[in-house]
UniProtKB/Swiss-Prot annotation:
This is Anhydro-N-acetylmuramic acid kinase. The keyword Transferase applies. It catalyses: 1,6-anhydro-N-acetyl-beta-muramate + ATP + H2O = N-acetyl-D-muramate 6-phosphate + ADP + H(+). The gene is anmK. Catalyzes the specific phosphorylation of 1,6-anhydro-N-acetylmuramic acid (anhMurNAc) with the simultaneous cleavage of the 1,6-anhydro ring, generating MurNAc-6-P. Is required for the utilization of anhMurNAc either imported from the medium or derived from its own cell wall murein, and thus plays a role in cell wall recycling. ATP binds at residues 12-19. The lineage of its organism: Bacteria, Pseudomonadati, Pseudomonadota, Gammaproteobacteria, Enterobacterales. The keyword Lipid biosynthesis does not apply.
Length: 374
């Protein structure tokens, strides 16, 4: 087993920053030791958003963005090392998920694309880097997502209790940790993505702090029904989605079927959409005793309150109460996946992704021992 210290990097679909964590990992434990959040410059964020929504881009601009993100990820790691006093040679590997700019798991040639050049990360830090975690699963017929349920099971499953883990990032995804049943998980639909995009358009703020703007509006029932009628919510698992599907263009097409709707009412309706689509899936799967929530959405009290109201009898709690940082869950998960890859262990779950078999995940970008920086 390649036990040791690992660094995980995650920027996520919300684009609210680059989360970097340092953790000591072995076969049985993941012990977080430090965290750091690195800002994403607005020009880079805007380029990513444009690409995710299908805007044309030259190969030159695409390549430059790939390099710039790789450099930015490396700088985030170097800041964490400086903050902690940990030397590069003390770190076994870096795990970098990369920034998803396209995810298309269906069709004749399924594909997923994460950018942020791992060569830049390995070269600038002198640390072996593991990246490109999703495409091997997809090559075996899987969705390439979600990859979190295996990690959720390793850290948060209980032998008797029915538990589900909900990650509310840009997209919301659910992991079913039900005793005696195969581990399952899938994307329920939009999490913070539409809420943040709508807030930026109308308030020029990165997110709706504490759901205050949404509280000033009312749920528009006709709009809500139009949104809930989308085919994605009716599809059976395994399924996964992203910004290339749930974006402002999607919302505007739904709005075009109605008369004018006040912006604050749209925001209130989007909160209800997120909560309702999550709650429906929890109940469809037979419910649970504990719904453990992580990701940025856990800090939106309006979303959390709606989940509690829609799921009576289920304890809705942050994963922090169970010993795992909700803010750092995804970065920790990819650090753990890198540990599994370097240890020769599979990282995917066919019961979750639909892949034909278990497999190692990720590509390894090694460094020469002589280049390790002290």
């Amino acid at each position: 087993m390649r036990t040791g210290r690992y660094i995980g990097i995650m920027s996520g679909t919300s684009l609210d920053g680059i989360d970097v964590v340092l953790a000591a990992i072995d076969e049985h434990t993941v012990a977080q030791q430090a965290r750091y959040c690195h800002p994403i410059p607005m020009p880079i964020k805007q380029q990513i958003l444009a690409m995710c929504q299908g805007q044309a881009v030259t190969l030159s601009r695409f390549g430059q963005l790939d390099t710039r993100l790789g450099i930015l990820f490396a700088e985030a790691v170097l800041c964490l090392l400086q903050q902690t006093g940990v030397a590069p040679h003390e770190v076994t590997a870096i795990a970098c998920h990369g920034q998803t700019v396209w995810h298309e798991p269906e069709g004749v040639a399924p594909c997923t694309l994460q950018i942020g050049d791992n060569n830049c990360i390995a070269a600038m830090t002198g640390i072996t880097t593991v990246g490109d975690f999703r495409r091997r699963d997809m090559a075996l017929g899987g969705q390439g997502a979600p990859l979190m349920p295996a990690f959720h099971h390793a850290l948060l499953a209980h032998p008797q209790e029915r538990r589900m883990v909900l990650n509310i990032g840009g997209i919301a995804n659910l992991s079913l940790l039900l005793p005696g049943q195969p581990i399952r998980g899938y994307d329920t639909g939009p999490g913070n993505m539409l809420l943040d995009a709508w807030t930026w358009r109308h308030r020029k703020a990165p997110y709706d702090k504490d759901g205050r703007w949404a509280r000033s509006g009312q749920v528009h029932q006709s709009l809500l029904q139009h949104l809930l009628a989308d085919d994605y919510f009716l599809r059976a698992a395994p399924k996964s989605t992203g910004r290339e599907y749930f974006n402002l263009g999607w919302l505007e097409r739904k709005l075009s079927r109605l008369g004018p709707v006040p912006a604050q009412d749209v925001q209130a309706t989007l909160v209800e959409l997120t909560a309702r689509t999550i709650a429906q899936q929890v109940l469809l799967c037979g419910g649970c005793e504990h719904l453990l929530v992580c990701g940025g959405g856990v800090r939106n009290p309006l979303v959390m309150n709606r989940l509690s109201a829609l799921l009576p009898g289920i304890e809705v709690s942050p994963t922090d109460k169970f010993g795992v940082s909700g803010d750092d869950m995804e970065a920790l998960a990819f650090a753990w996946l890198a540990f599994r890859t370097l240890s020769g262990l599979p990282g995917n779950l066919p019961s979750v992704t639909g892949a034909r078999e278990e497999t190692l995940l990720g590509a390894i970008y090694p460094v020469m021992p002589a280049t390790e920086k002290t």
